[in-house]
């Protein structure tokens, strides 16, 4: 839906890519203006963008990594398809999307697990039209270890709404 079109700031995308250091093949399912895609250093990279006729939900090729800011209204559907075709999935989204239901938790557990939750402050700090807490969720196929919790902002500046002060 049009409300799902929230472009990721390039500065945010670069920080996320630098943090996770994806190797191998990589897919950006919601390319938009290319904040993630244009900064992937991987040679084997691909993209989807529904507005350009490349529907991610029809993409079937296996990839090593997916890193994206998914459409929030179809979050579960997007995650389910991502888990089918990738070994490592990183979603940049409101963090409450992840822990909303037992059904979703069971799907994640059958895939592997959440390796890391990276808190990145509020949506407004990253150009999102809301102030909910946002961050990255890193899902890894077959993972059964502890979940790491990371903060990607300066804790002493918590509450400041400037992205420059955090990244």
Feature locations, PLM:
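Class I S-adenosyl-L-methionine-dependent methyltransferase catalytic core
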Residues: 1-167
